[in-house]
Design a protein with these regions (language model features):
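Outer-membrane beta-barrel "beta-signal"
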Residues: 99-101, 170-181
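Transmembrane beta-strand segments that form the barrel wall of outer-membrane beta-barrel proteins
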Residues: 39-53, 72-80, 121-125, 157-168
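Short cationic/low-complexity microdomains
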Residues: 95, 138-158
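Cleavable N-terminal export/targeting peptides
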Residues: 1-39
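Gram-negative (and chloroplast) outer-membrane scaffold detector with strong preference
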Residues: 63-133, 152
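Solvent-exposed loop/turn segments connecting transmembrane beta-strands
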Residues: 46-58, 86-89, 138-141, 162-176
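Transmembrane beta-barrel architecture of outer-membrane proteins
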Residues: 42, 55-57, 94-100, 143-145, ...
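Short glycine/proline- and aromatic-enriched beta-strand/turn motifs that initiate or cap beta-hairpins
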Residues: 28-72
Length: 181
C-alpha cells in the first residue's frame, strides 16, 4: 500500500473541527442575529481544494437558495494522482459532476447570519480515467453521498468554507472560498 503524502485525515478533521468551533464562538459574540446565510433566489459561487486518499481535488460549484434554509446546487471537481500497483506505476484522473441539496441551520439554531452550518446529500457521476493495463479498482459510475460543513462570511459577499463528505468518490474534506451574489 502506498503511503499518503497528505495530511493525516484524522488530524486534519480534529484541527478543522476546533477551528469551526472557534469561528462559531467568535462570530456569535461579535455579530447580531440575522435572517440566514443565503436568501431564496440568491446564488453563491464556491471554489477550492479538497483532501482525500485519491489526490487533491480542485472544485467549483454553484448553490441556489430555493428557501431561506435550503439550497440546491451543482459542482464540478477534478483530481489527478499517481499510484504504484503490483510493481507498476499508473496515473489516474477522476472528474466528478454532482448535484447537491443542503439544509442550512442558521435560523433553527439561532446563530448569526455570517455563520452558515449546513448538511445535505449529493449525487455525483464520476468519470475515472486510468492508465492502460491497470488492474486495481476504479470505474466510472454514480455515487450517493452526504456532507456536513460550515461557512464563515467575513463581509456581505465573501466567506471561507470547510466541508466533510462521505460515502462516494468525493469523500474527504474540502476547504475554499464562497461568494454570495
Amino acid at each position: 500500500m502506498k503511503k499518503s503524502r497528505f495530511i493525516n485525515p484524522s488530524d486534519f478533521r480534529k484541527h478543522t473541527l476546533s477551528l469551526l468551533i472557534l469561528l462559531f464562538l467568535t462570530s456569535y459574540s461579535i455579530y447580531a442575529q440575522g435572517d440566514g446565510p443565503i436568501s431564496k433566489g440568491q446564488l453563491q459561487l464556491n471554489a477550492g481544494l479538497g483532501f482525500s486518499g485519491w489526490g487533491v481535488p480542485v472544485y467549483i460549484g454553484l448553490d441556489y437558495g430555493v428557501h431561506p434554509d435550503i439550497t440546491i446546487g451543482g459542482e464540478l471537481s477534478n483530481r489527478n494522482y499517481n499510484e504504484t500497483f503490483l510493481g507498476s506505476g499508473y496515473s489516474h484522473s477522476i472528474t466528478v459532476i454532482s448535484v447537491n441539496s443542503n439544509y442550512h441551520f442558521s435560523k433553527l439554531l439561532d446563530i448569526p447570519s455570517n455563520l452558515d452550518i449546513y448538511a445535505g446529500l449529493n449525487l455525483g457521476f464520476y468519470i475515472w480515467n486510468t492508465s492502460v493495463g491497470y488492474q486495481g479498482s476504479g470505474s466510472s459510475g454514480l455515487g450517493l453521498g452526504a456532507q456536513i460543513g460550515g461557512r464563515y462570511y467575513f463581509n456581505d459577499n465573501w466567506g471561507i468554507n470547510l466541508e466533510f463528505g462521505g460515502a462516494n468518490t468525493t469523500s474527504g474534506s474540502k476547504i475554499g472560498a464562497s461568494y454570495r451574489f
